[in-house]
Amino acid sequence: MPQTRSQTQATIGFPKKKLSNTLKKPNSRDCEVKLRNVQPVPTTPCVDVKLLPLSPRKRLGDDNLCNTPRLSPCSPPKLGKKENGPPRSHTWKGCRLVFDDEPTFKASPPKEQDRVRQHQIRSSSAQRSPESKADPEQKCPPEKESVCIRLFKQEGTCYQQAKLVLNTAVPDRLPAREQEMGVIRNFLKEHICGKKAGSLYLSGAPGTGKTACLSRILQDFKKEVKGFKSILLNCMSLRSAQAVFPAIAQEIGREELCRPAGKDLMRKLEKHLTAEKGPMIVLVLDEMDQLDSKGQDVLYTLFEWPWLSNSRLVLIGIANTLDLTDRILPRLEARENCKPQLLNFPPYTRNQIAAILQDRLSQVSKDQVLDSAAIQFCARKVSAVSGDIRKALDVCRRAIEIVESDVRSQTVLKPLSECKSPSESPVPKRVGLAHISQVISEVDGNRVTLSQENTQDSLPLQQKILVCSLLLLTRRLKIKEVTLGKLYEAYSSICRKQQVTAVDQSECLSLSGLLESRGLVGLKKNKESRLTKVSLKIEEKEIEHVLNGKAFTGNILAAGLP
């Protein structure tokens, strides 16, 4: 039988486990280890001897790798999960998406030239010495510059600037009102500088520049002339006509004037206004016709104050009614001293509206946002209806908003070098005649749709007759507001004449409420329904223009009240 193992084997004696019954000391011979025929294993000398705990659980950090074989110095480092994937294609690194709102920082020309020279030197050296390509330090390509891509969105600041100058606030210049402003300026110089009391009444349709002209002149006077106090009150904000006296006392700022009430307050105000010491007081009452009261005591008292002895009051009233002093205040005609100076503001003409719009837009830039044809079309439409400059400004501003929304919806990607500042760029899109026509049709269609038969928003027949009755009644009585009782009488007479069944008075009130929700009329409710005041919220010319477009309502207006 062949011999497979060496007959001489190494024997290793393991220490025996101590038992409780084993009390003998182990023999030294049993503990000896006899190794025969075993070649010694060469070991690598260890420079740093580090004592480690026996249990691997007690080892921390890199100590757990003490039993792993040592890596050769030429082995590559361990790759992460992201680097173990397939090789990527060559792409631009560090692309930045810059929005147009962020400031762009450009490198200075010298630094940019140095960077170009260094790039040329590197490229030339790489072509001359091919050995440098094998250098391990240059295996990775140099990091390329980050490409700046701008998401250029057309801001259109020209539209924003145009909307700012087309607002309804008091402008620096008021074209087409030089004559009226001259009359007001001379009146104030005469009475303020001469310390002479007086009264002035400004009349005209809405949007003709009455309040704007007076506000601009008062602002200029505060810088030039000292020694006067101006008080501006809008009578529409007052609860009643009698509330004007506490409002005046509060604006004067004297505590002793605010304590009394009723007639005592009026006496205190008269005493204060006729005192020898004190500055001149310019009292401006806008919407003065809202102070209409029983017997017109409030209006008579206000117009009589400037003519008291030693009075320091300069009263300026503003209202839409042309004949307020002649019709409502006939007693002022009897006393020549109490009659105020009258100044009427006529509606703006087509040429005046066009000149105002062009003057406003010329303050922004040379390239106007609105075409000249669009401006002329807007001026012609507004002057034919009311001559209200505020309506023309609103129409143009709304048309600019429509074009601006279209331009903002266009997002364009452009290189950074081609992006110019919005102020330097030309107008991307101008407001044309079609945009003005669209806005005017929307405004007229939302407010009045009386002449459209096949539209769902068209008014019913009874509401049309009620609007015709209100228009005819206000013209006959020459007042802005009528009671519901008088309106119902006029409505009933028109229905009888046109052979149309009329509704009762309670339903007439509900019809007025529906017209109020459409913005056609205004209601001032009272405890008694007959005393509810009804007024038109739209210009008479505008309503008449729409009502005449239909045969039935046109015949009612032509026939008038029976």
Swiss-Prot record:
SUPFAM superfamilies tied to this protein: P-loop containing nucleoside triphosphate hydrolases, Winged helix' DNA-binding domain
Pfam families listed in its UniProt record: AAA_22 (PF13401), Cdc6-ORC-like_ATPase_lid (PF22606), Cdc6_C (PF09079)
Phosphoserine: residues bearing it: 55, 72, 75, 129, 421
Primary localisation category: nucleus
Gene Ontology CC entries for this record: cytoplasm; cytosol; intercellular bridge; mitotic spindle; nucleoplasm; spindle; spindle midzone; spindle pole
Composition bias type Basic and acidic residues, residue spans: 130-140
Domain of life the protein comes from: Eukaryota
InterPro entries: AAA+_ATPase, AAA_22, Cdc6/18, Cdc6_C, Cdc6_ORC1-like_ATPase_lid, ORC1/CDC6, P-loop_NTPase, WH-like_DNA-bd_sf
Keyword field: ATP-binding, Cell cycle, Cell division, Cytoplasm, DNA replication, Mitosis, Nucleotide-binding, Nucleus, Phosphoprotein, Ubl conjugation
Location in or out of the cell: Nucleus; Cytoplasm
Residue ranges of the motif Cy: 94-101
Annotated stretches, region: Disordered: 1-34, 57-140
UniProt function note: Involved in the initiation of DNA replication. Also participates in checkpoint controls that ensure DNA replication is completed before mitosis is initiated.
Annotated protein name in UniProt: Cell division control protein 6 homolog
Source organism: Mus musculus
